[in-house]
Amino acid sequence: MSEDQYMGNLYQRFPVTVEKGKGAHVWDIDGKEYIDCMGGYGVALVGHQNKRVNDAIKEQVDKIITVHSSLYNKTREEFLKTLIGLAPKGLTQVHLNNSGAEAVEAAIKFARKFTGKKGMVAMKGSYHGKSFGALSLTFNPKYKKAFAPLVEKVSFASYGDIESLKEAIDDDTAFVILEPIQGESGIIVAPDGFLQDVRKLCDEKGILLIFDEIQAGLGRTGRLWACDHWNTAPDILCLAKGIAGGVPMGATLVRPDILASMSKGEHSSTFGGNPISCAAGVAALKSITEDGLIENSEKMGKLFKEGLEKLKENHTMIREIRGKGLMIGVEMKFE
């Protein structure tokens, strides 16, 4: 466990040194097998050592490892076409980056530039990352207090409450950002009708709507996109985690008129669109959409919730079970 002397105290560490993985299982250096319930905090979406992803990475490594986006690359082109072919309606352009926080940072800049406005509205209970802009949109004070003051002109509305959102916006609001299912705050599912109401309100006020599907997207909820449960599309969509099968990647999907407002050089990423990440991304997206992972998430999620509900009948400490697909949370009570 000598990593600690080099990495400081930034992470909650567990006394397991992982050596290898396969599917939903990992093995430590002593050969002990574990079921990986962590999954890299949502990254191992297609499982460890997914054959499609492994083969794609090996093939790409033998061609070229890095190509900056100032040059063209066929692997990147294939990934972009694949991703846009699956994107919510109207989102036909992409900025490729390296993480969820970077995807959110790009969304902030794009929305502010396009609207010419500065105000930002996020939700109470939100989590969007720990870089400065994303942290400003994250609700939990424990992540923010030590770094104040953060980005100004951020307001928070109560999740699921359209009247609270109406009070939070003003004439200088550039965008509203929300997770269709809040992850870090406890798997809080948007009430039916809420996303549609937010979409209507944003359209009426000329405000952009950003969905953060970094955790909820890519089939986890039994739909490719969590927002599909409510037939509502955003103006900007933030993705990361399992998008490249475990290789670092983030993506900010956007309407073309929004991205057209940006001038060359106003935003970029040195490693965004890396060919290895893109090769892995094509493979991961094909695995999600062609190997039955979305359907499996819906089917197994129903079975899992049914089993949890039976447990709840006999265990009063279980307060509530909520979620969609295999994105499930169990709230406990200890009174």
Ranges and model annotations:
Residues 1-335:
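Conserved N-terminal phosphate-binding loop of PLP-dependent enzymes in the Aspartate aminotransferase
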